[in-house]
Regions:
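Cytochrome P450 core scaffold surrounding the K-helix E-X-X-R motif
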Residues: 85-91
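Extended, non-globular alpha-helical segments
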Residues: 78-79, 152-154
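Terminal signal-anchor or tail-anchor transmembrane helices
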Residues: 3-33
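N-terminal signal-anchor transmembrane helix
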Residues: 30-44, 62-68
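A structural motif shared across PLP-dependent enzymes of the aminotransferase-like
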Residues: 139-151
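Short N-terminal binding/cap micro-motifs at the start of the first secondary-structure element
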Residues: 54-58, 84
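Glycine-rich beta-strand-centered segment in the early N-terminal region that forms part
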Residues: 65-81, 94-141
Length: 154
């Protein structure tokens, strides 16, 4: 067998092993853990998910109202739409979605994508929006009373 065919076969075998390992890693789903009880100074209600699965993994929780960073705005959510992407995030499928949301468990517990609301706070670098502005946007887990959004994307 020629050397180039041996190298090609080795490269194909390595590629298959890599793809198989990635598939097994992405398919891993960690069990849901109980929430950690801690003191909350600025509470808000939110729908969250701590693990991948069906609607049974969604729970109403009381969490901290987030503080906007310099480039963010805090929006009081007036409406949040259910988007097909939310279903994929919640289930973690197709497994390639887990590269964005977290392998084993979600990195961000907030769920939801589309929202509309009123600006409550603005970060120090934000000049495009002011408190009281009506805005809409996507991302960040808006199935909650408040959501953070990047000012440049809203």
């Amino acid at each position: 067998m020629k050397l180039r065919y041996k190298i090609l076969n080795g490269a194909i075998a390595l590629t298959l092993v890599t793809i198989s390992t990635l598939a097994v890693t992405l398919a891993y789903t960690k069990n849901c853990e109980s929430p950690v009880i801690r003191e909350i100074n600025n509470p808000m209600k939110a729908i969250i998910y701590r693990c991948y699965g069906g609607p049974e993994v969604l729970e109403q929780a009381v969490i901290e109202i987030p503080e906007p960073l310099a480039h963010q705005i805090l929006v009081r959510v007036k409406a949040a739409a259910v988007n097909p992407v939310d279903w994929h995030y919640m289930r973690g499928s197709p497994y390639i979605m887990r590269l964005m949301t977290g392998i084993g468990v979600p990195n961000d517990q907030g769920i939801g994508t589309d929202f509309a609301g009123i600006v409550e706070k603005v970060g120090s670098d934000v000049t495009k929006f002011k408190i009281g502005d009506a805005v809409f946007g996507g991302g960040g887990g808006p199935f909650a009373e408040y959501v953070l959004a990047n000012a440049s994307k809203s």
